[in-house]
């Protein structure tokens, strides 16, 4: 019984991280992440995505096996206590050609990497996926396998929390 109580205390004492976590690569620099949530950064190798439309014309990404690299940044706000449907997430997807990782793009050139933003919440009329065509994206080579990604962007269609991504990543 004493061990169950200690286990309960251990589980209850866990706290959320306040910085970005990089999955499938090495984290060196964390993007600014709001204190009220967690941020993750994923490198999806040998994957590709297309931007599809559903039956009502809303956009969504369709991820399939491919020969490109998908970068996925996610901000997930901590759930608000005592609320139903209080979840809130923002995602940014980028697709990179593995043979041409160094890039410097702005505005409509962001279409070259299929820059896609998602706001997922119970926010009537203000949720969904949106093409990013305002901003700048720079990926510079630091070493043989390490790159610095810096992105600033703006979405006019919906409010956004995340407007900047700054990561140093290693491709395996």
Predicted features along the sequence, with ranges:
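A structural detector for beta-sheet-dominated domains
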Residues: 44, 72-76, 95-97, 106, ...
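Sec-dependent signal peptide recognition
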Residues: 1-7
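Sterically constrained small-residue positions within well-ordered secondary structures
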Residues: 5, 62, 85, 128-130, ...
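Acidic, glycine-rich flexible loop segments
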Residues: 108-166
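An ectodomain-focused feature that recognizes extracytoplasmic/extracellular
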Residues: 17-125
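A short, surface-exposed beta-strand/turn
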Residues: 90-101, 159-172
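C-terminal motif of bacterial Sec signal peptides marking the signal peptidase cleavage site
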Residues: 11-13
């Amino acid at each position: 019984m004493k061990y169950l109580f200690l286990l309960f205390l251990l589980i209850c004492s866990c706290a959320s991280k306040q910085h970005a976590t990089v999955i499938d690569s090495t984290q060196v620099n964390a993007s600014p992440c709001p204190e009220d949530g967690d941020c993750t950064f994923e490198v999806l190798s040998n994957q590709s995505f297309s931007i599809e439309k559903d039956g009502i014309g809303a956009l969504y990404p369709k991820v399939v096996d491919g020969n490109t690299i998908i970068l996925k940044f996610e901000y997930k706000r901590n759930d608000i206590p005592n609320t139903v449907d209080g979840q809130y997430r923002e995602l940014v997807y980028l697709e990179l050609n593995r043979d041409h990782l160094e890039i410097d793009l702005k505005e409509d050139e962001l279409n070259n990497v299929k820059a896609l933003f998602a706001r997922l919440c119970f926010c009537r009329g203000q949720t969904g996926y949106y093409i990013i065509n305002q901003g700048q994206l720079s990926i510079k080579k630091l070493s043989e396998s390490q790159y610095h990604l810096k992105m600033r962007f703006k979405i006019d269609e919906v409010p956004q929390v995340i407007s900047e991504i700054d990561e140093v990543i290693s491709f395996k």
